[in-house]
Each structure stands twice: as C-alpha cells, then as structure tokens.
C-alpha cells in the first residue's frame, strides 16, 4: 500500500520504523517493525514473511539457525499481527522487487512477538480475489485491509483535508449544524427519531443542512462550509449510498452565480492537479443552459467526452411527405437527428440492437438512414424525396459511410430518448477515463406542469430566486420563468445542484402562490425562514457537491461503496453491525411506541 504522505512513526517497543518507508539508506540499521502477515513463504531453509502496515510491505527473513523463531513462524497464519526486531540488509540484485518501495532491502529478524494469531480467514486479503459483496460488507474491517480499498479511504481523508485548507484560505468558516432537527414534508423520506421527553413527537435526521446554512447567512457569516452528513430514506444506486452520505456544503452571502462558480472551479482544479493523475478538460467550465443541454445532449447530466451531438431537423420536415415526422413539427414537438460517423456499413444486428435500446427508452421504434457505398438504405428512405435527402445531407454534413438516427415527438420525451441513444453509442468510442469534463447546467425552468396532478409545480428547488424576480412572476407565463438554479456535472455524473436563494418574503409568497400554496401554508411550513428573512437577509447562494461521488470519480470506482469505510448494502442494511435491528419492549415503552408489523400474506394452496 503506497502512501505518498510520509508517516510520523511513534517509536515504542512495537516499532521504530514503518515497513513501506524502509529502503537501501537504512542498510545495517537495527529496526523494530509491527504489522500484519501479508504472505508467508517457506523455502525449505528460509522463511520469508511479507509484513504489511499502513505505509506498505517489507520482506522479513527468518534463517534456519534461528530454530525457535523458525518453529514459531511455521504456525503463523496470514493476517496475524506480529512485532519484530531485526537488521536491514540489501537484497541480492536478482531478488530486488521493483513493485515495492522497500524492494531493495529485507529485514533479517532476531526476535518476534505474536500479538494476535489470526484464525482462518473468510476471504483472502493478499490476493484480492473476487469476493461476494455480502461477505465483504459483513467482514468490512478485513476488506478494508485490501490495498485498493485501503488507499481509497486514505485518499478520501487527504482530499477532505485539502478541501478544508482551500476553503479556509478563501475565508470560509466551518460550522457544524444540528443532526436532530424537524421533519420536512418535501424531498425524500426522512429518518425519524422519537423523542423520549416529548411523547408522540419526533426529530428528523437532516436530509441536508439547507435551512440552517441559509440562516447562517442571515446571522452574518458570509462564507460557510461543512463536510455535512445527510440522511435520506431512499433506495441505493451505484452512485448513491442508502441511508447516509456526505456533502461539501457551502453557502455565500452577497454573491452572484458566477462568484460561486469561480470558487468551486478553483477548488476542483486545485485538488485534481495536486492529488490526482486526472486532468480537467477546460477551465472555466462550460456554461450550458437547460434548454441547450437537452437539445444537444438529451440530458441535463451530459458526458461531454462522448463525441456525438443531437441536432434539430424539425424545420426540414415541415412539408415532408413522411407524416410521422411532419406532424411533429408543431410547437411543443420536434424531430431530432443523431449522426454516427463511419458506421453506415454495420450489419443488421447493429441496428436491431439499437432499435431494441430505443424501445427500452420509450420509443415506438428507431428510424435511420445508412449512407452505404451503394447508396442510402434504411426504413426511412422510401418516404423521403430527393430534395429531402439533399437537405438532410447538407444540414447534417453527412458523408458516405455515415448513419443518422431519428427521433420525433414531444420535445422533452424525444430529447431524452435521443440522449439515451447517445449514451448507448458511447461504447463505440474509447473515452479517456483520466479526462474530467466538467460543465455547469444553468437557466433551469422555475416551474413545470405536473401531468398527473394537472397543476403547476416547482421543477427543482422552490427556494431559488426567479430570474427577473417579482416582475417575472407577475408578467410571464409560469412555464417560461427561469430560476437562478445550477447543476455541476462531470463525465455524466451530477455532483451537485445549487441556487441563488430567494431571500425576499414577498417574492417567496408569490412564487409559492403560482404553485398553488397559500400564504398560510407557506407560513406553516417555512415560517421560521420567512421570519428570519423579515429581519434582514442578505442575497446569498450555495451548492453542496457530494463528497462520496467526487472521491468515486477521482478513484476510478464504479460503485460508491468502494470509497466509504462502512457502507450499507443495497437493502440499507449494515451486515457487519446487524443494523437495523429490533429493540427491547422496555426501550419502546420508554419512547411511548408500539410496533405494528404488516401482516404476512398467507400462502395459497
């Protein structure tokens, strides 16, 4: 395990040096080492032990004349904990191990103490063979000894420290906000905590410190941050841990959107350049409006490394004889095209698989035109005139060997389907995993139409400041109002959402009224915020990048559990601690609670 930060060793009876920091400069020095038996090899006359500590591995040698040591070492199991004393010697030239930082030396030990002899292991630590996630999580303390996971946790610690240093240099103040707070009906489900002192009442674990950090702005702390634990009762995903996660929570007073962008871009550029081999594509990060990103990439979380872009061809089909496309040239609908260069001569299987994926995304089918060596082919060709084909070629810059895929229908639905196809075709390209292609998504709609409830709803954060403030709310159609909301995205992963906040009570009342809330409802739900804003609130805004996701990206991990020391499984269970678990009746009575479990369905037959 390589650790780029030199270790300060506490000298005592267990150790004077660290395994991974020994090298040829320590030749003939007497050392004390302690750690875990990584591997043991008996070569007849000699026993070799790879001793591992937090800094790396060092090879120990027990010579045959040391009969007592030899006998003791023969019964050692892997992962036993030992402390040794010995002398550093240089390895023979043909025995040097260039993969180890201590590979030029070995330690001939003179005495050994077995601090803890390990029982047979549930899985191998040294070989890192594939192991079921269930077993890994049950014995997480053992899993954490494995090199890659161990290094991920060390990296996470170093990254957190670097973030703190950077923000402190930018005059941010770290402030801890409450863990026990009130429940909010918005967002994900809360984790509830019953109150013993107030029977029938509950605290909630915070889904985010959102309201507290805004109140800190009102309190006169102009730059706040916190590595904040957040709790949401939601299902697991590869990039989301169930139960709890950590975010870099930030808020700033007297700022505009671009001021916050500059701070976060500077921080990300700093930690990437100093702590990672990865490189950022472009600084400042591109700013892309929500409308533009949906039109071009079909998602508000685009992976800009994919060399494909959706193009609008609605105007080309206004008078087309192909009625399926012509009827989707009216307002609110569109016709989109996705050109894949050099793939026009693929087999039928290629197109069948693409159509299957399009149907999985919600499309009725997938129209396409292949520009093969012998001419244009595909199910759409017979419906298009020569003029239509020429217009397409010119508009899309099509060449022989290309293929163009089409989607048509309602604007948002069509964009999303074509965005899904863009991601599907990403496998045709070799994307650089060391490239970090960040972007800001801006100008989100303030409202959206809820088809199910047949009403106007907030599309994102209801506490965002509308662009144009009160004038926009009073004079514009609700669905045309934009908000000062923004997302930061990297390689198709959303790291965070943020916003410039609505700090003016009358604008807040009006914004909620458009979404169907009365003043009384707003006061009932958010009265403490309204009251604070009436007593002098500065303009402010913030963001909260997910720390777990950022570490996941920088460590090249596909699963967020690989960067969390003690994660839950996908069923929100801690297999190591057997949580959640039942509690005693006495504990429930003390909290004035009674558990009523759902009735099990009786098996028929």
Curated annotation (Swiss-Prot):
Transmembrane segments: none
EC number, as in UniProt: 6.1.1.23
Keyword ATP-binding: yes
Superkingdom per UniProt: Bacteria
PROSITE patterns reported in the protein's UniProt record: AA_TRNA_LIGASE_II (PS50862)
BP GO terms, sorted: aspartyl-tRNA aminoacylation
Keyword annotations: Aminoacyl-tRNA synthetase, ATP-binding, Cytoplasm, Ligase, Nucleotide-binding, Protein biosynthesis
Chief location: cytoplasm
PANTHER family given in the database record: ASPARTATE--TRNA LIGASE, MITOCHONDRIAL, ASPARTYL/LYSYL-TRNA SYNTHETASE
NCBIfam families, per the entry: aspS_bact, PRK00476.1
Name by which UniProt lists this protein: Aspartate--tRNA(Asp/Asn) ligase
Species this chain originates from: Chlorobium chlorochromatii (strain CaD3)
């Amino acid at each position: 395990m390589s650790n780029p930060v030199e270790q300060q060793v506490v000298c005592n009876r267990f150790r004077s040096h660290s395994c991974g920091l020994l090298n040829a400069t320590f030749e003939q020095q007497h050392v004390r080492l302690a750690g875990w038996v990584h591997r043991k090899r008996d070569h007849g006359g000699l026993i070799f032990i790879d001793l591992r500590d937090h800094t790396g591995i060092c090879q120990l040698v027990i010579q045959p004349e040391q009969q007592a040591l030899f006998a003791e070492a023969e019964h050692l199991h892997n992962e036993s904990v030992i402390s040794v004393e010995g002398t550093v010697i240089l390895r023979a030239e043909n025995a040097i191990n260039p993969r180890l930082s201590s590979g030029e030396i070995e330690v001939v030990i003179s005495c050994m103490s077995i601090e803890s002899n390990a029982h047979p292991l549930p899985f191998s630590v040294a070989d890192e063979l594939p192991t079921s996630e269930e077993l890994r999580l049950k014995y997480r303390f053992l899993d954490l000894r494995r090199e890659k996971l161990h290094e991920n946790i060390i990296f996470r610690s170093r990254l957190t420290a670097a973030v703190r240093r950077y923000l402190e240099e930018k005059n941010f103040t770290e402030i801890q906000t409450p863990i026990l707070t009130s429940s909010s009906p918005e967002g994900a489900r809360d984790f509830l905590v019953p109150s013993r002192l107030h029977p029938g009442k509950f605290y909630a674990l915070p889904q985010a410190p959102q309201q507290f950090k805004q109140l800190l702005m009102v309190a006169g702390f102009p730059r706040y941050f916190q590595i904040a634990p957040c709790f949401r009762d939601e299902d697991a995903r590869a990039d989301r841990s169930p139960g709890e996660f950590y975010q870099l929570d930030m808020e700033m007073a007297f700022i505009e959107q671009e001021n916050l962008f500059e701070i976060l871009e500077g921080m990300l550029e700093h930690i990437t350049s100093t702590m990672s081999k990865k490189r950022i594509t472009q600084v400042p990060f591109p700013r892309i409006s929500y409308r533009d990103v949906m039109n071009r990439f079909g998602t508000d979380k685009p992976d800009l490394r994919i060399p494909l872009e959706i193009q609008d061809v609605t105007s080309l089909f206004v008078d087309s004889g192909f009625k399926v496309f012509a009827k989707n040239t009216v307002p609110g609908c569109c016709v989109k095209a996705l050109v894949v260069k050099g793939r026009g001569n693929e087999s039928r299987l290629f197109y069948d698989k693409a159509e299957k994926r399009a149907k999985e995304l919600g499309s009725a089918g997938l129209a396409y035109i292949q520009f093969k060596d012998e001419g244009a082919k595909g199910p759409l060709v017979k419906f298009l005139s020569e003029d239509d084909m020429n217009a397409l070629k010119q508009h899309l810059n099509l060449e022989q060997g290309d293929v163009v895929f089409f989607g048509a229908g309602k604007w948002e639905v069509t964009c999303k389907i074509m965005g899904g196809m863009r991601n599907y075709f990403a496998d045709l390209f070799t994307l650089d995993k060391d490239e970090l292609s960040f972007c800001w998504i801006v100008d989100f709609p303030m409202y959206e139409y809820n088809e199910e409830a047949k009403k106007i709803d907030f599309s994102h954060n209801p506490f965002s400041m509308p662009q144009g403030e009160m004038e926009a709310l009073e004079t514009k159609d609700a669905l045309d109002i934009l908000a000062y909301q923004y997302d930061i995205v990297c390689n198709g992963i959303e790291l965070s959402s943020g916003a410039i906040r609505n700090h003016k009570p009358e604008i807040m009342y009006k914004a909620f009224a458009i979404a169907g809330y009365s003043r009384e409802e707003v006061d009932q739900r958010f009265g403490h915020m309204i009251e604070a804003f009436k007593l002098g609130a500065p303009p402010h805004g913030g963001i909260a990048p997910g720390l777990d996701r950022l570490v996941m990206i920088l460590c090249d991990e596909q699963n967020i559990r690989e960067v969390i020391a003690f994660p839950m499984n996908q069923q929100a269970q801690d297999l190591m601690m057997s949580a959640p678990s039942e509690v005693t009746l006495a504990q429930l009575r003390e909290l004035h609670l009674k558990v009523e479990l759902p009735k099990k369905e009786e098996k028929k037959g």
